[in-house]
Amino acid sequence: MREILFKGKKKDNGEWIEGYLLDGGMPGEKRIFIGKLVIGKWTVMADEFDEVDPDTICEYTGLTDKKGKKIWENDILMCHGNSEDLVKTVFGEFGVRNIETWSIVDKVVGWHYEIIPTDTISRCEPFCYSMPLTKDYIDRCEMEVVGSIFDNPELVQGSL
């Protein structure tokens, strides 16, 4: 079973924090917190929660890169040690393609990666298509976390 964790940038200092997600629950201004839960036999208590910028909240995929680092939503991964072979981690709907015709034959919802166009080949079919993010793909492509869309927006533009 996958560990359900979130991370976000603290509102007070921009530092990343990971833990459980807690909605402030008050009407009006939306306030989101991330922190630890203390689980007792009969109780669950929130402990050490910090307010985070809601725009930076990312969910843990349950997967790790080739070096054992957690892969989060919106992370940027480098494949095969090649700085021009970059992908972004995404959760959502994507097309399942027929391997012979490359036409979309189905749609699924789940963790996948989207190609970041950095060179001519990454803009060409079939290399530009989204693929499921699985342990097998991570291992075969030697994927490594090199940043996130929040900390390294220049990587999304395709320049390392």
Regions found by a protein language model. Give the residues of each.
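Secondary-structure transition motif
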Residues: 1-160
